[in-house]
Amino acid sequence: MAHKKGTGSTRNGRDSNAQRLGVKRYGGEVVRAGNILVRQRGTKFHPGNNVGRGNDDTLFATIDGVVTFERYGKDRKRISVYPVAAAAS
């Protein structure tokens, strides 16, 4: 067994914190205005009706309502929030 660590092992041992990205509110969930819907890098999901986009591409609800995931175009997804009364009918 070596009594010295060796140069490689002493230089390792670093890791960055997780960014906690992903969908935070799923389709059919009732949300309040300002709730974060998705944290993402780039626009995997695009903002739809009543959804805003932050500087870091985070999508958030601008009104109280129900979350819906929609497809549009050939290969794009968008997230919209519709008022609860409209979603019930």
Swiss-Prot record:
Cellular-component GO terms for this entry = cytosolic large ribosomal subunit
Q: Where are stretches of biased composition, namely Polar residues?
A: 7-19
Keywords, in A-Z order: Ribonucleoprotein, Ribosomal protein
Q: Name one Pfam family in it.
A: Ribosomal_L27
Record GO terms (molecular function): structural constituent of ribosome
**Which InterPro entries would you find in this protein's record?**
Ribosomal_bL27, Ribosomal_bL27_CS
GO BP of this protein: translation
Q: Where do the segments described as Disordered lie?
A: 1-22
Similarity comment: Belongs to the bacterial ribosomal protein bL27 family.
Know the name of this protein? Large ribosomal subunit protein bL27
Q: Which organism is it from?
A: Cyanothece sp. (strain PCC 7425 / ATCC 29141)
Q: Which gene encodes it?
A: rpmA
